[in-house]
Design a protein with these regions (language model features):
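Gly/Gly-Pro- and Ser/Thr-rich, intrinsically disordered tail segments characteristic of DNA damage-repair
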Residues: 1-184, 322-379
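Residues in well-ordered beta-strands of folded domains
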Residues: 27, 63, 183, 205, ...
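Short Gly/Ser/Thr- and Asp/Glu-enriched loop/turn motifs at secondary-structure junctions
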Residues: 55-59, 97-100, 240-244, 295-299
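Short, hydrophobic beta-strand segments
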Residues: 60-66, 264-270, 313-319
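DNA-contacting surface of Y-family translesion DNA polymerases
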Residues: 140, 148-296, 312
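Short, glycine-/Ser/Thr-/acidic-enriched flexible segments
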Residues: 252-254, 307-309, 353
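C-terminal hydrophobic structural anchor segments
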Residues: 284-340, 344
Length: 379
């Protein structure tokens, strides 16, 4: 089976026969395991490099300023790779360059030609840099994507090298300042700083497709309560309070002979909160505004916004909406117990017990690193 046979993002059931014929082993999404292994990789990188930006769950940028003075960069990249492999048993690609955009391309090459490169590519050499840029399609450049690449192709810009040689004035005129920065980065001019601390989130969204179509209000309400509780937990992790809360529901837009229905509702609290009880209560009120019987719902979710760094807002003279007494201490206990004894140790009754609406993960691999019950047993 070759990659051209597969369609990215297509549902499993549509490609199940293809997988079976090719002997492909499939697993359900194991978010808990992914997050824990990601944390171990990032912790390892932070021990090796003085400055690290965690870009995503499986990607990070390391500042190697000054390393060249005492180490060969390719050797240092191999050391990073070997250390991560030793501690986590995960193979990573290492791309080294003067800018983030070039480092992403170097990483792309390290993964694509792993046998030839040993999983490490250093683009410090300008000639090597240009050779790689000449064979990389422009759509593979970080931040370009399909829509912009089509317009670039129409202008005769086919490769990353072609893009790097364009006038920044023309690129800015026909596109935007973001693509202009990409051109400069491809030339080795740093335009994107390393962000050691993630910027404060402007919103938090918690949503998931149901394991099967849901028709009962109670099941959707349980899902909304669970997403609201998770959103509140994330909010406290960001040391933020929110005032804006919304909930949404939708049916599948692809269902045959079924009318599509999707809707959302929101409300703004007078006093900012990070209390799960307030957020759950508001989210359920939003659900009640948009709930319609007779639909087979595919997905639901909540969004939190209008953040404050502390639970204080300007009240009117006759307002009587003080924060709950003991709220912060109670939420601290809730989060501490769930962190210590496992998620879901303490939960709100509104979240339900059996949760039949949960996403089906029938091929879930064990969560070896976070659950004692999933540890391997030696007989």
């Amino acid at each position: 089976m070759c990659s051209s046979d597969l369609t990215m993002g297509a549902p499993y059931f549509k490609q199940k026969d293809l997988f079976r014929r090719a002997g492909v082993v499939c697993f359900s999404s194991n978010y808990e395991l992914y997050a824990d292994m990601s944390s171990r990789v990032m912790t390892t990188l932070e021990e090796i490099s003085p400055r690290v930006e965690i870009y995503s769950i499986d990607e990070a940028f390391c500042d190697l300023t000054g390393v060249r003075n005492c180490r060969n960069l390719t050797d240092f990249g191999k050391e990073i790779r070997e250390t991560v492999l030793k501690r986590t048993h995960l193979r990573v690609g290492v791309g080294i360059a003067q800018t983030k955009t070039l480092a992403k391309l170097a990483n792309h090459a390290a993964k694509k030609w792993q046998q030839q490169t040993g999983g490490v590519v250093d683009l410090s050499n300008i000639d090597r840099q240009r050779r790689l840029l000449a064979i990389v399609p422009v759509e593979d450049v970080w931040g370009v994507g399909r829509r912009i690449s089509k317009k670039l192709n129409a202008m005769g810009i086919k490769t990353a090298l072609d893009l790097s040689e364009q006038s920044t004035w023309i690129i800015r005129k026909h596109f935007n300042v973001v693509l202009e920065r990409t051109v400069r980065e491809l030339r080795g001019e740093p335009c994107l700083d390393l962000e050691e601390f993630a910027p404060t989130k402007q919103e938090i969204v918690c949503s998931r497709s149901f394991g099967e179509r849901v028709t009962e209000y109670e099941q959707v309400r349980q899902a909304i309560c669970s997403y609201a509780a998770r959103g509140a937990e994330k909010l406290r992790g960001e040391h933020q309070y929110c005032r804006f809360i919304s909930a949404f529901v939708k049916t599948s837009p692809f269902a045959l002979n079924e009318p599509y229905y999707g809707n959302s509702a929101s409300m703004t609290l007078l006093t900012p909160t990070q209390d799960s009880r307030d957020i759950i209560n508001a989210a359920v009120k939003c659900l009640d505004k948009i709930w319609k019987e007779g639909h087979r719902y595919q997905k639901a979710g909540i969004m939190l916004g209008d953040f404050f760094s502390q639970g204080v807002a300007q009240l009117n003279l006759f307002d009587n909406s003080a924060p709950r007494a003991g709220s912060e201490k109670l939420m601290e206990v809730l989060d501490r117990l769930n962190a210590k004894d496992g998620k879901g140790t303490l939960y709100f009754a509104g979240q339900g017990i059996q949760q039949q609406w949960q996403m089906k993960r029938e091929m879930l691999s064990p969560r070896y690193t976070t659950r004692y019950s999933d540890l391997l047993r030696i007989r």
